[in-house]
């Protein structure tokens, strides 16, 4: 009997080790699907004009308010389910892959300026048929969400800006200092060696990743390298669109959430933003980097839930 018990314990461990080593894509996809399931979100596609968009949706329910999630540069809709799972089933949850990201179409002949991305996001939201919604955007997605709330306010009930882009912060973040010094963009990977550098910049507490999972993550990221290089040029220099000019035009309630240790977009951005907003709520998460929804999913969800329910 003792041998049987040992075998029952050892065999699943051995099986997982083999799968992890020889089928990391399966492990990666299984983890992603588990997060979606925990959040009650299912994958969908929708054709809007000439482009196909992928999105996650927990399902229409007229008795629940809707939250629209907008991811950042080089990211995707699946950055959100871990956080969304802590929202307790009180909302309809819709996370959209922006054009050029995730499983949505990836054209190279369009503009990826924030204003262009905002207009495309609006068309997707209209096509899905959302009557009104709360919006949360991270990084580049926060820049998009802020501009959306300022320019297309009719259906926006509130907006949460999560470590958002679009602000010329008083203190320059480490990533921008590095790029100014000639180092490569830490958000764009060129080899598996860049994975550790990526997480050093994005998180305080790095996720555990086996060598095979790390290699698979790098493979997925490197496949997007050329497109990400192209998109990034629309977010800087002459293409930069200053969100500070939009903030005074936001009429919906605004919440700002930032990781205290963000190395991509500095927390001092709040010093610029707060005077331009009325009655904004500010949450600074200690020991947190650029991706609070992944590094601190429960705390980020609780801040969002508390904010929405206070309105």
Question: What positions do the PLM features span?
Answer:
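Flexible "cap/lid" loop of the alpha/beta hydrolase fold
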Residues: 150-151, 157-190
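Short beta-strand/loop motif that positions the catalytic acidic residue
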Residues: 250, 256-258
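Active-site loop/oxyanion-hole signature of alpha/beta-hydrolase fold enzymes
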Residues: 49, 56-58, 95-136
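Conserved HGGG/HGGXW glycine-rich cap/lid loop of the alpha/beta-hydrolase fold
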Residues: 57-103
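Acidic catalytic loop of the alpha/beta-hydrolase fold
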Residues: 261-265
């Amino acid at each position: 009997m003792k041998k049987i018990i040992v075998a029952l314990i050892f065999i699943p461990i051995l099986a997982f080790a083999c799968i992890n080593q020889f089928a990391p894509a399966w492990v990666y996809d299984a983890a992603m699907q588990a997060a979606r399931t925990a959040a009650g979100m299912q994958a969908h596609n929708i054709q809007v004009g000439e482009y196909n968009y992928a999105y996650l949706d927990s399902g229409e329910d007229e008795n629940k308010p809707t939250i629209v999630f907008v991811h950042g540069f080089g990211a995707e809709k699946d950055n959100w389910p871990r956080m969304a799972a802590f929202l307790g089933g009180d909302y309809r949850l819709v996370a959209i892959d922006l054009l050029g990201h995730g499983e949505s179409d990836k054209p190279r002949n369009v503009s990826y300026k924030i204003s262009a991305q905002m207009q495309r996001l609006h068309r997707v939201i209209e096509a899905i048929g959302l009557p009104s919604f709360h919006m949360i955007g991270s990084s580049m997605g926060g820049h998009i969400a802020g501009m959306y709330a300022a320019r297309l306010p009719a259906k926006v009930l509130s907006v949460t800006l999560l470590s958002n882009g679009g602000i010329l912060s008083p203190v320059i973040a480490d990533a921008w200092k590095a790029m100014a010094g000639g180092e490569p963009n830490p958000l764009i990977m060129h080899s598996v060696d860049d994975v550790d550098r990526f997480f050093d910049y994005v998180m305080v507490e790095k996720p555990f990743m086996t060598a095979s999972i790390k290699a698979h993550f790098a493979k997925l990221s490197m496949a997007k390298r050329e497109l990400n290089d192209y998109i990034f040029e629309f977010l800087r220099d002459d293409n930069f669109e200053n969100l500070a000019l939009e903030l005074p035009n936001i009429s919906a309630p605004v919440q700002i959430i930032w990781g205290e240790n963000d190395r991509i977009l500095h927390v001092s951005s709040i010093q610029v933003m707060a005077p331009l907003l009325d009655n904004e709520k500010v949450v600074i998460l200690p020991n947190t980097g650029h991706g609070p929804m992944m590094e601190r999913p429960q705390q980020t969800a609780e801040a969002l839930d508390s904010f929405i329910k206070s309105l």
